[in-house]
């Protein structure tokens, strides 16, 4: 984790609980629910892999790299980091003395006709000084705690950027795989349409030869129109998906280059999930929640120390003379030193309310931290079972498609042999088309579940 030893101490209760098998009062499971029982439980995890080691399609990698530069959410996150870093500088500056230098020279000529004594004389007065403005001695550590809170907020904003990066990588990969699936659907629809048009031609020829009825022709036409109708709908989805990917990558709507087709995209047969305890170190949203907790604990300390006296110093050192020629001589030296102690006595309950507010914010940060951890475990468990079951569904769907393909061929052979009706052959063709579409979607779902699992395990920001 990126926190310093001081930050560790600030969340000591959390770390101690982790060593005891709990975090923020919640038990840390020894393994993820839904993990492959045949895989050994160790510290390796797909979440430790860099995104380009998981998604190996060249065109997909180009899209991800473009998104890393142009994506609006990422650019917003970077701007927030810059703001948080500036806030650290502001907090740190309050711990340091602030100096100012100044000089003034005044020349006065007194009128001869006025009432002033010494009329007609010209007088010059000058001064030059170096001063430090109200420097507070941080006796109780209030300013140090304020700076500590600002630094924790900076680290939290850096972790937030990593969280956004993980989301962007997942969104680009998910959109790309969905686009490839639509390409496969379009190819299947066009091939099916061509096949059905050929069947219609043959059936029309059989009708002319007295071997088929007008009803047979109409039924064949129905399948042609059904296949033809799906094509513009798929093309619409393709363009909309391309537009969405263009937006994620920070570009105007346009075509998206493709790499390998859907059925050639690599998946992992065995996905190691790693140890649940390592997830707490890997996921940036958990680390951000921890840093927010560190910041809120520091702000509680700041609010409490506001009851204590504040000691501030103000000083000035310089030269002053009514004659410029003597400005830098010894007798012209001047200095001022003003120590000041301020003790709040009555603030109308403001300081007590500040403490209550800070404590409430700290409790909110604790709850958010607990919720973030619990949600992380849930997301991993959901993604693991999704990945496993989608692979099982795809395997069964492949068997179903093979069976329906054989059935369709046999049904047409029986129809052409005159031992079965055309309706059975057309029904077989319709069921085969639907099953092939479902198989294409199951291939997409397998890749999408891999994306979701990678995100849930904290991958994508490395």
Task: Please place each PLM-identified region on the residue numbering.
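Periplasmic alpha-helical coiled-coil/stalk elements that build and connect Gram-negative outer-membrane
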Residues: 2-3, 143, 152, 159-275, ...
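Regular, well-ordered alpha-helical segments
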Residues: 86, 93, 159, 166, ...
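A short glycine-centered flexible hinge/capping loop motif at secondary-structure junctions
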Residues: 207-211, 415-419, 456-460
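Terminal intrinsically disordered/low-complexity segments used for targeting and assembly
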Residues: 1-69, 151, 235-281, 287, ...
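C-terminal structured "cap/appendage" subdomains that terminate the fold
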Residues: 408-440, 446
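Short, acidic/charged, Gly/Pro-enriched secondary-structure junctions
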Residues: 75-93, 102-106, 294
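Small/polar, glycine/serine/threonine/aspartate-rich low-complexity segments that form flexible
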Residues: 39-56, 60, 65, 104-132, ...
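Sec/SRP-type N-terminal targeting helices
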Residues: 75-76, 92-93, 137-165, 215, ...
